[in-house]
């Protein structure tokens, strides 16, 4: 399990764009399961939509990409790197995410060759599928 302090050591994202609150399981270099607690105080609800708050789908995908980043960085070979979003396939949204929901974020690295990685990702709320996709990343060194 990784708390927010450990997550910040792995990911370069910060408020308001750090979208992973806690990691609950890790299979080193392979799979990560994480949580995003969606609260009424999220900055994006000010405009999406004030009278009918719904978490934007692109931010659900970003939370899944960040979860994938944590999974990729668990591999010793990828320490000090960043996974840059390079593509997405088969993305489908099945349910809205609203204040009070807890997103369960799952990312499994399915391919890692050179500087290219792919992850199969899934987000659920209380067992209901919210989003699934396959995301591709280009690994790059972090600037010193």
Curated annotation (Swiss-Prot):
Active site per UniProt: 48
E.C. numbers: 4.2.1.59
GO aspect biological process, one term: fatty acid biosynthetic process
Alphabetized InterPro entries for the sequence: FabA_FabZ, FabZ, HotDog_dom_sf
Top-level taxonomic group: Bacteria
GO CC, any one term: cytoplasm
Keyword Lipid metabolism among record annotations: yes
Subcellular localization, as worded in the UniProt entry: Cytoplasm
Record's catalysed reaction(s): a (3R)-hydroxyacyl-[ACP] = a (2E)-enoyl-[ACP] + H2O
This protein's UniProt keywords: Cytoplasm, Lipid A biosynthesis, Lipid biosynthesis, Lipid metabolism, Lyase
Pfam family, one: FabA
Presence of the UniProt keyword Cell inner membrane in the record: no
Record's function text: Involved in unsaturated fatty acids biosynthesis. Catalyzes the dehydration of short chain beta-hydroxyacyl-ACPs and long chain saturated and unsaturated beta-hydroxyacyl-ACPs.
Family per similarity comment: Belongs to the thioester dehydratase family. FabZ subfamily.
Full protein name: 3-hydroxyacyl-[acyl-carrier-protein] dehydratase FabZ
Organism: Listeria innocua serovar 6a (strain ATCC BAA-680 / CLIP 11262)
Gene from which this protein is expressed: fabZ
């Amino acid at each position: 399990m990784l708390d927010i302090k450990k997550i910040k050591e792995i990911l370069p994202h910060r408020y308001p764009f750090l979208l992973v609150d806690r990691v609950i399981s890790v299979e080193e270099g392979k799979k990560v399961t994480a949580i995003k607690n969606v609260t009424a105080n999220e900055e994006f609800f000010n405009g999406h939509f004030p009278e009918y708050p719904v978490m934007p789908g692109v931010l659900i995908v970003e939370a899944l990409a960040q979860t994938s980043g944590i999974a990729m960085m668990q591999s010793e070979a990828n320490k000090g790197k960043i996974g840059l979003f390079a593509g997405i396939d088969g993305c489908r949204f099945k349910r809205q995410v609203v204040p009070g929901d807890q997103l369960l974020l799952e990312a499994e690295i399915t391919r890692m060759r050179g500087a290219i990685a792919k992850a199969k990702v899934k987000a659920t709320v209380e067992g209901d599928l919210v989003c699934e996709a396959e995301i591709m990343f280009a690994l790059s060194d972090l600037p010193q």
